[in-house]
Amino acid sequence: MSGVPTPPPPGEMSSGPVAESWCYTQVKVVKFSYMWTINNFSFCREEMGEVLKSSTFSSGPNDKMKWCLRVNPKGLDDESKDYLSLYLLLVSCPKSEVRAKFKFSLLNAKREETKAMESQRAYRFVQGKDWGFKKFIRRDFLLDEANGLLPDDKLTLFCEVSVVQDSVNISGQSNMNMLKVPECQLSDDLGNLWECSRFTDCSLYVGGQEFKAHKSILAARSPVFNAMFEHEMEESKKNRVDISDVEPEVFKEMMGFIYTGKAPNLEKMADSLLAAADKYALERLKVMCEEALCNSLSVENVADTLILADLHSAEQLKAQAIDFINRCSVLRQLGCKDGKNWNSNHATDIMETAGWKSMIQSHPHLVAEAFRALASAQCPHFGLPRKRLKQS
């Protein structure tokens, strides 16, 4: 989704004519995508005009505008009987109408987009109205195995939607003598203070290594350090903190984040850094670690990641790990190869990994949570046919 509109930068306003007042109009556009896989496509409805519908989808959980895809496997009418027809349908909408552009494509055996067709303009949708292509792709071309569009008899459709939202205006007065304000260097300055150990007033000992720091900065950034130095604790009296459950390289990365808000080596140590961030109540760093771990989920590590998320109350990571497990389970039932890398050539079962077997023994409640989520997951539904199928 496009963000809050900003006025034109000074460079644009100072080149060429400059007016005393100006207005900047931002047309907001919400973009989202949807993937629909139809298993055993060759068994789909064979009569012209018969329809198959996807489940409903939207741009996000808070979006009340619901869409679905509608496909006619053997065309919509006599003109398109040798084609597959594909449409985008507005199922429900809180507004009287909405304008949207769309793009359809097929995913081939290599999971690459092909045979893309895009609307040339933003069409006007009202509830129950659909737009699309009567002649999206010829059936004989689609069914030809040499073209690789139905791997394992699965048709995968990919749809990208761009919904036009309300426009926003920002206006103001021009300043003929604009000054360029230098970028803030606070992060770099504090980083240098940490790297050079200047004006430090406390020492932190981790794994036999000493790290000199500034109590005021530690207290300002971490509620845990704040409590440690604020009260008459041993660390506050001696200006010394002994830390035994964090590796030195992980601690150094955490301290760099405390001073600069950056963690350049986060990807290499996201699991250990998440534990340290949780211990010292560094919420932003914790979520950054969750994001990195979400992006690296795999069949082999998802069980260990789920345990880590549960141990450190990383709720977003926990939800993503459970969702990954469930998607793998559903896709395996449908005959897909691998839950995350759908184009993988090997069918690895999460439940056969050492991490999963260990989790059954040490954290059985997580196994129960994963299965409860799987049981409550919604499955795609098919639309009713317009005609009865011929019986063979």
From Swiss-Prot:
Residues 200-267 form the BTB domain. Disulfide bonds: none annotated. Residues 31-161 form the MATH domain. It comes from the Eukaryota. Keywords: Nucleus, Ubl conjugation pathway. Pathway: Protein modification; protein ubiquitination. Belongs to the Tdpoz family. Component of a cullin-RING-based BCR (BTB-CUL3-RBX1) E3 ubiquitin-protein ligase complex that mediates the ubiquitination and subsequent proteasomal degradation of target proteins, but with relatively low efficiency. This is Speckle-type POZ protein-like A.
